Amino acid sequence: MSAPEYLRYTVAGYDEFCLGFGGESARRILIIPPLFDEMNRMRRVLVSAMRNLAGRGVGCVLIDLPGCNESLALLKDQSLDSWRDTVDTCATQLAVTHIASIRGGALIDDRQRDLPHWRLAPVKGASLIKTMIRTRIAGEKEAGNSISEAQLMQQAETAPIELAGNLLGPDMITQLAVAEPLALANLTERKLGEDIIGSPLWLRAEPQDDDAFAANIAADLDRWSASCGG
């Protein structure tokens, strides 16, 4: 079994972390996970897929974004644009050859346009906001409070708001509301259930394992990265 590597990259004055497998392989895929609470639900499957890839001789790196996990940066200070810069910086510093993104990760993967890109189930930013707002409204209702989507969005114009356990600032909310995955020249897009068989674990209440899903992701990434160079 391939041992994990704990890697660092530096952005905006902070040392941020990545989880890596496969060492200095000829192919090195930067994996951008889903954003916010979806990130936590998919992490186990992505790590399993990375181990599988390493067993195939393919290197991979799972980025930890500023404001997430062990980062010392504050999530409320982040925006989609700052995360785009982060992905760009990480890809350069760690010398990756390919970029793979899942769900909302496809909203921040577009700065390294010369690299081959792979996306699984890309989503618009507005869809992510709506899902998180529904969660917040449901939680408020259980607590005996009443708040609307319009009220939350108005609050978000001037101050950070908590959505699904994430404290998001005005810049993040504003950019998410209009964000769509950008078209790229060297792009492969995969649909869940058609191109890759698996369950939408990002919708589950808790993180779950799915070894078959992880293996399917790894097999597709292996074929794709081999076919498009690197």
Segments from the language model and where they lie:
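Short His-Asn-centered micro-motif
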Residues: 63, 100-104, 120-122
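Hydrophobic anchor at the start of a short beta-strand
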Residues: 58-60, 96-97, 115-117
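The alpha/beta-hydrolase serine catalytic core
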Residues: 112-230
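N-terminal cap/lid segment of alpha/beta-hydrolase-fold proteins
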Residues: 1-27, 206-215
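Alpha/beta-hydrolase active-site loop
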Residues: 45, 73-97
